[in-house]
Amino acid sequence: MFQIYHSNKLDLQKDLLVRLISRHPLSDPFQPETILVQSPGMAQWLKLELADTLGIAANIDFPLPASFLWSSFTAVLEDVPARSAFNKEALTWGLMELLPQQLSQTEFAPLQRYLEQDEGQYKLYQLCGKVADIFDQYLVYRPEWIASWESGDDLPDITASQPWQPILWRTLQQHILGLGLSHWHRGNMFNGFVAALNAGKFDHTELPARLFVFGISALPQNFVEALQALGQRIDVHLMVCNPCKYYWGDIVDPKYLARINQRWLSKPGMSVAALAESYHSHGNPLLSSMGKLGRDYLHQIQDLAAPEIELFEDCERTSLLQSVQQDILELDDPSSERVLDAEQKRVLPAEDRSLQLHSAHSPLREVEILYDQLLAMLDEHADLSPRDIIIMMPDVAAYAPYIEAVFGNAPFDRYIPFSISDRTLQQESPLLQSFLRLLGLPESRVTVSEVLEILEVPAVLRQFNLDSDRFERICRWIEACQIRWGIDADQRVRQGLPPFEQNSWRFGLRRMLAGFAMGQSDSLWHGIDPYAEIEGLEAEDLGQLAEFVELLEFCCERLQQEKPVAGWFEVINDILQRAYQPDEQDEILLSQIRQVLEQLQQQLSDSHYQQPLSWAIMRDYLTAELGSSRASQRFMVGAVNFCTLMPMRSIPFRVVCLLGMNDGVYPRAIPPMGFDLMAEHPRRGDRSRRDDDRYLFLEALLSARQTLYISYIGRSVQDNSPKVPSVLVSELMEYCQQNYRLDSDSDNATLQQQLLTEHPLQPFSDRYFTPESSLFSYAEEWLPLLRQQGNTEQSFMTRPLVAEPLEDLELTDLLAFARNPVKHFFQRRLKVFFNSAGVELQDEEPFQLDGLSLYQLKQQLLDASINEQQHQCFERMVASGQLPVGIAAELQTRKLRHDCQEMADKIRPYINAPERIECQLIIAGIPLNGWLTGVYPGALVRYRAANAKGRDMVQLWLEHLVLCASGYRLQSYFFGLNGRHWFDPLEQGRALDYLQEWLNAYRQGLCEPLPLPADTAWILES
């Protein structure tokens, strides 16, 4: 028996399924029920529903359509292998071997041109994968083409643009048969399957006792026919989720009809009457625009002429959402014949929030807004639980970081449990990401950021006996040794670059090892500038870093060689053993990599492909396979579900939320391959990603029981310019405005305002916390900030701190206070230290020196020039990697060295026989102790390779006061690029008086911050 059931609600189909199972149990209690579903998510929902209704759900199989039909083929037909020799993977490897042999034929000229200069057969592998995918589609949707090609008919009317395809298919088929493999494939199996079922010569126990097909929105024509044929031997119940109670297989999207009208009437001799015979009424515009996938499926089912049962349930028009669902159910469009005025439109209650549209500035704001809206729904509806809410988006991986940031960091009192499905193992696992980075090293620049992303993976750190502190230490060494990119000169040559080693990993390691072995050195050692900051037990970390760099070098060298798959298995296993020390969870991930390699071995063995594989092919294969492996789905686990918009997610939820409904993003548009003959000759029922996405949106609209929530990026985060939503959102909004209105709404403005909420850029906008605003937020942590708005004067301290006794004073503390009084207060009294940011690592060698690097370079050159060692200093700078590579270093520093030499010539006469003076003064009973360096027979001298600034002169003034108060009658000089500045000698008593004023200021500065930076003070004094 083959029975079709139509219903607009999945709940009704579930109830029917329960009734059929409970009232008509299988004769053998140990035989499983078989329910065909399209996705694991649907299977999970159905298990929970069956268990809730029946008390238990056990001994039930939930196969997917392709796997079920193949198992049915093996049960009914003879000589059907467990794995088809015509599956996409087998076709790919077969084409890899056969296609190069065909390129000399005229028909293959386009492919021959494409495959020119194909190093390592990488382009061939990519092309064969695409051709195999196209052939696989032909087997399902154009089996008659395949049959004609195999019989020698090239179908020239169809293949005129791609005459190579029938030739290549015949060659491929003959090759597979020549290997002694089965001739069965999905193109010829269906006819054989139907014939075998009619003959009845097979073991009936291999088929399930009965079959339910549940929650599948579309199947290929031959799949449906195979199910009907199967119904001759077992009971097959095909449950169709049909959004409309009337036949709608012939309705047409009005916009599409308008385009057809224009093209039709532009042809000579064409009339409107002739067009009307070909195209029918468009019915409900939402159904006609978004329902092409379901419409084609309905058309296929109607052609079966099988018995049908209808189980439709009307929606109560208590809300806008239910009214729209009822319009679709009744194929109704009140505004189809005329524009409705306000009196003719259906009236909605003013508080209706069943359909919500939210405009945000960014994906993060979308998630933040969603969180507040969900909290409001949960507050308003006490019976609403997180498991009643599903949130879908075009790409869940793009939103996952924002979801975890907002939902994962919510405080306990407003925490909403959540789960994220549909992420791949690669997206969830840093270990797999690091493995793929290791695989990509042969064509990588091996930059510092890439390498450290590999090293900081916990399993890698464990392998090299490192922890987070040691990792940070290594980062500092890398930054100090100017490592930027590249293993060494040889690796750069392999990438077509000049053979230079500066700023490479080998360059930096040599500096570290030389520094550890030799210590501090004033000269180069064999052209190496030793880095002497590594000593003692840190040598172990240096050794681990060297071993890790050896691993990188091993990957770069061994991965670029072509090998048979067994050789690749050996090399990759070697990499895994050398790179990772896995824990229990990591071991599962590493086993996944090995399973993919074993899968590749099996595919090549099945295809009898024995040629060596290049690194590029292996990298692409492993990346694709690991990228398609799903992590734990965690779908329907009692929490808010985040998942990707994908087919058969039309599970009913009370609240359905759609994020990322942006123009150009959804519906997704994937252009067909240029050699896809199905795109040139389309038919009803052909799959299209854009049509699939339109139907997914319609399913989401129909599966929402209480609220449909839609958000999109409606404003630019850069300039606040408006952005339009997805065309599907616009169509829904337009439909609602044409057919519905709120009370007292005469121009649609009120309805639009009710449906669409535009949110501000920031979550702490005062619009969220203003009583008269319709916006709201549960994020009470923003309230203190908002309460301070308008308070122009914010007192950091209500009163000064209690003074601490000052028993003595170091000169260094007094100088630090003069340099930055506020910073000194925070450090001395509040114990707050403004440490500089972490190490900033660069991925490019220096091309142009930045301001800070230029100043540091000038200071080093000035110091060296004063000591008449400028040339040696320049050589060390080159050897340390601070300067650009090659002649650029000479050109960029030529004027700089000249200026430093001139300045040194001016300073040198003042510096002769330097002294270091100990100062011991008593200022107002407080001892002031310290040392003054750079004191010469004629003066105290300071210099800097920059213009003299206020902080320099204040520092010099304080040192000058200490010098004079200590009984020295000397001048104090400061040399800068803007000239020479000095202070004349002071009387000792006067200098002590000035120091007492500084001491008083110092005491005050320990009780409260003094807003008097040295630069500002010098400008005021000047």
Q: Where are the language model's segments positioned?
A:
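Polyanion-engaging groove/track-forming segments
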Residues: 1-1022
